């Protein structure tokens, strides 16, 4: 790091003293472990400034003092020598050796340590002058004096200036000392200058009294314990300062060598760690400063207590030393604070840079993703609603993206602020800021460009839709003008005014110039849109052409006629009407072939009379009618296509806005426990439905825009895939139950808020059910306007298929509500029919009581007709809401279809039929709600039994066909069965039947009815006692089923549609009627107007009309009742008619 600081210690060099002995080896070894109070600390910049240290920065000695007061504290306490602080006349430090009887007993090591320590205290300048030793031996002997002087002179480590000895005061000792000193003077002079003093006043001649302590007759205030305490504190403080300096040096080195991290987390950790260590260092500095100030106050305490107190030089030196140490600590703290501020700033800038870089990476990724998405939005829409939806999506996308754009711009401003604050990484920040600004501007420009394209598309589609609407309204206007009113002059003038008024609105609604459209909207015109523009323009031109033709025609009609209109007799073929017209009368003219075809389809369709209208008027009216129908077909097609697109979009919206969000971890906290892991229950197979529709339906419908009447083929090609709706509807009760339990979940509310939906999710979950039912309504409308078109048959088949799917869905919904059935309903085959009926039971063998009760108390049963069995269930209504309110069905019994037979008609009620079991051992009388429902059930049961019989026939490969399918009814001369019938008429119960044996068709492999209690779960052929339903009061409901075929009292019956066999030639047939021969099998399809019946000859595949007058008397009293069993026999039971002229008989199945 730049501006690095290092710590150095500065000391003064010690001047050599020729009088001081050399330090021994032990002293030198301990030198590295001692602290001098004069040691100072300061911070200097780098190595260049390290050489600039001067002597003025030094405090005391350079050499490290071998000892400190704490090390020899016990030796100093003996006080055999002390440094009082007094000075000689030339400033020499005075060391006093007081009277100490045990002086000779002091070990040399202790004496040397004390001398070394005391001589190291004064400054270098004072120590250089030399020390004055005052030896007080007034109470000692001469021998001790001599030994003490010689010991001191030999062991004194510094320069000696003078030795003053107060000799013994005793007479003998003083005399002895005088004599001994005279003889040994030369010995003393050779070592040290020694002055033998006899009294204290004589001492005062060498040293002023103010520099001597009180025990030497001076006035110097000295307390040895206080001096020792101060010296220990000062040296301890100096050591603390040194350790603090070393700590700062180590910390500074650590900071200087720290590499800047490359991520936010590491940088934060480094900054936090360094800040924590810096706080610890500052704490130690504050403790050192506090300690120093406390010592300084203690040194100044005597002067503070008494102003007259005199301060000696040593005390002043101590104060100066502490002050210098404090000053250096303050300077060190200031330098460290400055260094730390730079280091902290760099770390903080590094952290800011890492945050900026991390934010830059995130924002850049988001902006790149958004730019890719906006670049992928190339669709300009194919309709006005589609473009509006795209604009809405773009607005939502822009609002959603604004967060990232705002974040990017804020990050760019943050980078600019870092640059203004003189961040060290300007070269890295500046390019990123420019790139962020460029990305934001590029995204904004792309959104603006996209919005401009969609606005252009919206404008173009608005023009196209306006033109389309104008054309449609014009065609509607043309179609709504009644042709008969236009034949008069006033009517023509009124119609002409309508035409001209409408044409005036074309200026503001039409597309004026196609080339201008191409030029103005070139940027959005793709191939599909170009074709759409051309089609709209062509439609507009054709509409204008139609208007101009109508205008010209009306102008001619509106012109005033110059001569009156002459009455003209109508053409005979146009006026011919017969009470019983023959088909040939409508086919007599080539010009009326279309009417003839219409009448062939159904004479009940009344032809429009155009006798008073000219031929040209009739042709024009027909063309205009076709145009009107084409417009209606287009409207139905547009509705079908628009609703299909909206339906697909709604499905996608639900799947993305709700279903996908259930897997979003960010939304997991909003999902309640009851909703977790139940997405498949809530949404069923909606995703499968979406993919089917999105992949197939819109594209298929768009291919039929030009020919809407062909849309039936689109449905037929995909009819099998529509079966997926059955699965969705079967799951709907579970979905709705789950929704009711969790509808107040915050998850749904949040999703609805994000999607901006006004309706809740359950409304959208109902969309598939609504859609599958909507198709049949739209197909009905399309078929209504396409009856004579090419695709009418496909439309009819598609409608029937959709209705079949709806029926299957409805039946399956009932089927899953069955309870109590132990077997697998899937084993019973396809569900064909289901419905509620009133049921009576009749047991022929015993059970008389039950039979009687059954007549009066019908049971309400819900029947399920399968391919292999019919199930009887009891319907139970449920309480609740929605699908929970749907009924359930309790299983009661089932009948195997291999042992079932039916009797189609029961006398007394057109709504009743019979199902009998095991050769009429058990008979169930079924009453349907309406005759139509009864006919549907009978036909379906007949188909099942017939298919089973056909299977038996195919299984019998070794037997030949022995019986004919149909037998003529008896003639008046013979009431016995026909020749081919080898069985006698047998009366069954009270019924007269004419059984036809087909035993020859039955092979040995024919399935046999199961024994009672076997093969069918919970099957009981003894029907339970009738329920006490009550409410049956009509006489019709009390009729015994045996009354169905009683003889007598039956009048002529009206002929009903069905299959019959012709038993004699039609001798009264006309040239224009369908010719019938004996033995032909015919089907009476429907009754037309004017007494005609439309009949289809199944033998020759011819169709035609037969006058009812030729059939009414022949069929006046005929009636038939057919019964069928798949057990290998077919029975035709009919009433023997006494009338002689029967031509048609019901065809045996």
Swiss-Prot record:
CDD domains: PH_Dbs, RhoGEF, SEC14, SH3_DBS, SPEC. The modification Phosphoserine is found at residues 457, 462, 471, 480, 621, 1033-1034, 1041-1042. Guanine nucleotide exchange factor that catalyzes guanine nucleotide exchange on RHOA and CDC42, and thereby contributes to the regulation of RHOA and CDC42 signaling pathways. Seems to lack activity with RAC1. Becomes activated and highly tumorigenic by truncation of the N-terminus. This is Guanine nucleotide exchange factor DBS. The gene is Mcf2l. GO terms for molecular function: 1-phosphatidylinositol binding; guanyl-nucleotide exchange factor activity. GO terms for biological process: intracellular signal transduction; positive regulation of transcription by RNA polymerase II; Rho protein signal transduction. Residues 555-627, 956-1033 are annotated as: Disordered. Residues 632-812 form the DH domain. Residues 583-594, 966-978 have a biased composition (Low complexity). PANTHER family: GUANINE NUCLEOTIDE EXCHANGE FACTOR DBS, RHO GUANINE EXCHANGE FACTOR-RELATED. Residues 607-616 have a biased composition (Basic and acidic residues).
